[in-house]
Amino acid sequence: MSMRGLRACALACLIPLAAAAGQDGSAAALTAAQIVEKNAEARGGLEAWRKIDAMVWSGHIETGSPVAPLIPFVFELKRPNKTRFELREDQDKMVRVFDGAAGWKVRTSRGGAPALKPYTPAELASAREAQGIDGLLIDHQAKGIDIALDGIDEVEGRKAYRLVATLRSGSKRHVWVDAETFLELKTDREAHTSGTQPGIVTVFYRNWRAIEGLKMPTTIETHAADGKGGEKMVIDHVSMNPSLSDARFARPNDLGRHHALPGFQSAGPGDGSLPHSMGPSK
């Protein structure tokens, strides 16, 4: 798969997405507000998440391609809505940076000069609506997101509450919450491919683990709107509240220089260690 296609699928993983599955069940015993409250409790608590101002993930993407089956990535997030995403494939490097208002993308190819481009209008809209650190449900009122209960489905054999999240922009997302664990099973949104017709992008959240008392999915599987199969983002390590300068999320200037993550060793493919390793699966 090309870096362009991988980038689209990987970033779709960091923005909640998915398609409805199953039929509506009987009337739900819980309200949307109660489901959201139980979700926050299951993930470690609302106040605990409010204390997280920055986060760094490192791991790899399983592409399913024999050419580059595993591609290392580092994803940095800082409130209120700053992100930096870096992929490395052999001698190629792709970086996407969003400072909360504007975004840029840089690609360095083998033997070629780095190319810097601004985000497209569609990419900007997507980045501005991302809820990277804690997702759509946690602290949704502070984010201006309205949550409503839309029914009950079965997702991969598990009963799930289907919620509709309406963002400030008016765009909608669907979120399926496990009726037993109250963790997210999948989400969806409408997305445009290279064609003119929109499609539904689906993201499944798997292998939830406790990291410093907070629950996070460590496998995020994305199925793109064009239906060209799926990819898995596997999060191997997470750092909570690292020191991240705002310069990490500014317009890249020195395109030829690799900046190591603050406080971490610079690592090549296959060695993306961060100081905090995930605990056993819960």
Regions found by a protein language model. Name each.
Residues 26, 33-111, 144-149, 154:
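N-terminal mature ectodomain segment of secretory-pathway/periplasmic proteins
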